[in-house]
Amino acid sequence: MNLGVFPLLLALIGGASSTYPDYYEYYDFPQALYGRSSPNCAPECNCPESYPSAMYCDELKLKSVPMVPPGIKYLYLRNNQIDHIDDKAFENVTDLQWLILDHNLLENSKIKGKVFSKLKQLKKLHINYNNLTESVGPLPKSLVDLQLTNNKISKLGSFDGLVNLTFIHLQHNQLKEDAVSAALKGLKSLEYLDLSFNQMTKLPSGLPVSLLTLYLDNNKISNIPDEYFKRFSALQYLRLSHNELADSGVPGNSFNVSSLLELDLSYNKLKSIPTVNENLENYYLEVNELEKFDVKSFCKILGPLSYSKIKHLRLDGNHITQTSLPPDMYECLRVANEITVN
């Protein structure tokens, strides 16, 4: 166990110790293999002969979607000036699987008709860093991964029927809890949901119980309903850092979820350590107002087979010091690799 005193280096804290799963590990991205282009390609774009089903049209100052020839399955249109999508933009490529439109000028009113729902094989749709004010749709049932980050979204349309939708990225928007609650109820395959950097003051109701990863950091959440997380029987990774959580808004067993492996409550207003299940492995509580270390927050009882599985614990930026830690902490946290205190 490495128990030490660390200065509060904010630039270093922002994720240095985190073991959150890398979202991009879930996908094997086709890489941009620029070189000689396939003849079956839009003249302004690049379709590598070694990867003829991919068309790269990044950073070309395009104002509209170019002609997309049949056979293209992976289409990259990043960092352009595209401000509209016509209804027939993809009629030659109904087997398109990935459509990447990040860093353009798209608005909802200029995305015509059922341009996306016609793509019956589409699995990945990214429209990050655009000018959307609501989610796009209708969308095809084949969709697995939807990314709409860094827009101005305050309204979510219906996601009904999207039985394969597994990943949703909605961070850095203008969403409030009611907009989220109404939209996501029926997504039975959803495992990954990022709602960080929005405008929520409460936890949204009706989130799918299938979630494995839920990010709600950087909102204005101050209260957790009693047993809110109990129904998420598969939840493993939960972020609630940079909110307004205080002891009065956190019921005693809020985070006592047996499936939970990682919990981030850093940068809140907590004075006592919320109780967690013995299975939790990584717990981030830095920069709160914690006054003492209570072993019972980690171990209800102590014994040869009764101990916490905590590996990494962050307590720096609180009122807890190394000398104030109780002796039985070491027995409770016997498998910890790192405990960071002031």
Swiss-Prot record:
GO terms for cellular component: extracellular matrix; extracellular space. InterPro entries: Leu-rich_rpt, Leu-rich_rpt_4, Leu-rich_rpt_typical-subtyp, LRR_dom_sf, LRRNT, SLRP. Cornea and other tissues. One of its GO terms (molecular function) is collagen binding. SMART domains: LRR_BAC (SM00364), LRR_SD22 (SM00365), LRR_TYP (SM00369), LRRNT (SM00013). Residues 32-70 form the LRRNT domain. SUPFAM superfamilies: L domain-like (SSF52058). The keyword Lipid biosynthesis does not apply. Residues 1-18 form the signal peptide. It is found in: Secreted, Extracellular space, Extracellular matrix. It holds the Pfam family LRRNT. The modification Sulfotyrosine is found at residues 20, 23, 34. Glycans are attached at residues 92, 131, 164, 256. LRR repeats lie at residues 71-92, 95-118, 121-141, 142-163, 164-185, 189-209, 210-231, 234-254, 259-280, 281-300, 309-330. Sulfated on tyrosine residue(s). Contains keratan sulfate. Transmembrane segments: none annotated. The modification Phosphoserine is found at residue 308. Disulfide bonds join 299-332. Keywords: Disulfide bond, Extracellular matrix, Glycoprotein, Leucine-rich repeat, Phosphoprotein, Proteoglycan, Repeat, Secreted, Signal, Sulfation. Belongs to the small leucine-rich proteoglycan (SLRP) family. SLRP class II subfamily. Binds to laminin. This is Lumican. It comes from Bos taurus (Bovine). The lineage of its organism: Eukaryota, Metazoa, Chordata, Craniata, Vertebrata.
